[in-house]
Amino acid sequence: MDSSDLDKGLTIDEIIAKCIQSFDKDGKLSDPKLVQMFLMMHPWYIPSGDLAKKLFALSESGDNVERERICQFVRFWISEFPAEFDLNPELGEQIRDLKRALENKGNRRESSLIDIESVPSYGWKRQVTQRGPGGGRVRKTSLLFDHLDPAELAEHLTHLEFHSFSKILFQDYHSFVLHGCTVGNPVLERFIALFNGVSQWIQLMVLSKHTPQQRAAVIKQFVQVAERLLQMQNFNTLMSVVGGLSHSSISRLKDTQSHISPETTKVYDSLLELLTSSDNYARYRRRFATCKGFRFPALGVHLKDLMALHVALPDWADKAKTIINISKMRQVYKVVHELTEAQRLEPPVKANPDLLNLLTVSLDQYRSEEEIYQLSLQREPRARSTQTHAKSPPSPSPPLEEWASLKAKPDQALLCQHIEKMVESVFRLFDEDGDGHISQEEFQSVRSNFPYLCAFNEIDQNQDGKISKQEMTSYFLRASSVLDCKMGFIHNFAERTFLRPVSCQHCRNLILGIYKKGLKCKACGITCHKHCRDHLSIECKKRSKSVSERGESMEKGRHFFFTLPRSFRRSTLYPDLREEEPHMEDDGVFDDHL
């Protein structure tokens, strides 16, 4: 690659010509880095369909040598990025047109180089609801989370998150960088929801225990999980686990802290030190750079890099937007290439499909920050001396904030299939006597996996003292509907006195009178009568207070905002935080755009 050309930049046509000229008649590449970089990065500058049209036009006007090089270029494109041709039918058809045109002109040798029909299906990369592949022997005792080996739990968490990570394509990164959020990006949205789900599930598992000793034992177990994740070089799930353990609802549990051993504290501190954001995550970057074999990057850090590059450097080197800024292209390519290389290596673990089903549902047991904090207060109430302090809430999740304020909402049919399969797993694993029902004793084992499962009698609809598959399926479907499929963002209503006429979004009647109180959602601002609350079917769409570079308001709607880890506290397992009363803004809760 001529460095002088790169320094001054290249037009689209110039870089296409350079890529084509990199191939000899035998298909050998003289500059593979340039070709690989352009084929990955070209959608940033030109749609794939337009690139295919340019190649078609060049093949029509070129000589035999030129046509053969073009076909070698297309062949390399298909071999390196096959998913593009399966997931983009228009692009696939354009390449077929090129192949047919070559055949019609008698260029069968060149045409034979283009084999698009052998491209496998990549539809699974666009499926948001995930299913784990089979493997492993069913062991009932290992599926109780209280007794699950930390290494095994770390491996299954790795399997779940990496499966979701492997679906992310270049177009998803590109969309995220352009919008600054996951608008219209369900694959990345689901990945973020899973990341947040792990963090929140850890908080719920700790808070599900009633004594400080039990909670300390759960914390120790998850620190051991984090150790195993580090051994596996899974930095993404490691960040999620550390974020859950350092959440303010856990860090305020002083009685629990007193039962955590110095050894556990030392391990935890070392993990915090590794993941600190100091010097732009320098410690994590150094550690990740030395990794060989399977490695799972902390995606949030690398997305931050992409955002920073996009904001700092222009796409084009001229005002007319005809000359590509090759410097930016190379830097963005380096980040994305590192992520795509990590996707190629499968984790060296075998997954138990029944455990994956239970774990997936457990991770989707959505609770609001306020609900979790209130549960924390129930476990360890405030000391009297702290009750007079404080008007603003503790930071909701130091050191690692959630990436998103919204969970992905799955297709209803897929949700039903997922719940039915999960129920089958529950009965296969916990129906000890094989009578097709869950007894009260067996129900206690099931509840270990779902700390906030309702009472036995509420699931046992016919009150015969046992739960059938139909009753359990019905319960989960019912619960999913109430909680917006356990993954959606439900309304966060608060009483409000309206000083001007406001209409109810359910019955459309006015909420009138100075002393007439109604309800207003703190997230999306929707209003309704108290008696209409349970009948309201409108989805909560959290408002954005974001401003683009041009000062324009970002699009309001159902999308994600991404927040990165902040600096970790280093001295102790949990810093001495002053407890403060949870507080919400009167007019709404907003997300800040990067």
Swiss-Prot record:
GO CC entries: cytosol; neuron projection; plasma membrane; synapse
Keyword Transmembrane helix among record annotations: no
Summary of the function given for this chain in its UniProt record:
Functions as a calcium- and DAG-regulated nucleotide exchange factor specifically activating Rap through the exchange of bound GDP for GTP. May function in cell aggregation and adhesion.
Ordered alphabetically, the record's keywords are: Calcium, Cell membrane, Cytoplasm, Guanine-nucleotide releasing factor, Membrane, Metal-binding, Repeat, Synapse, Synaptosome, Zinc, Zinc-finger
What positions does the domain N-terminal Ras-GEF occupy?
Answer: 3-121
* Zn finger spans (Phorbol-ester/DAG-type): 490-540
Chain ranges of the Ras-GEF domain = 149-382
Where is it located? Cytoplasm, Cytosol; Cell membrane; Synapse, Synaptosome
User: Which superkingdom?
Assistant: Eukaryota
The entry's protein name is RAS guanyl-releasing protein 2-B
User: What family is this protein classified in?
Assistant: Belongs to the RASGRP family.
Write out the residues that bind Ca(2+) 1: 431, 433, 435, 437, 442
Tell me the segments the record calls region Disordered.
377-403
Pfam families from the xrefs?
Answer: C1_1, EF-hand_1, EF-hand_5, RasGEF
Q: Where does Ca(2+) 2 bind?
A: 460, 462, 464, 466, 471
Asked if the keyword Oxidoreductase belongs to this entry, the reply reads no
Q: Which residues form the EF-hand domain?
A: 418-453, 455-482
Q: How does it sit in the membrane?
A: Peripheral membrane protein
Q: Name one GO biological process term.
A: Ras protein signal transduction
Q: Which SUPFAM superfamilies match?
A: Cysteine-rich domain (SSF57889), EF-hand (SSF47473), Ras GEF (SSF48366)
Q: What is the lineage of its organism?
A: Eukaryota, Metazoa, Chordata, Craniata, Vertebrata
List the GO molecular function terms.
calcium ion binding; guanyl-nucleotide exchange factor activity; zinc ion binding
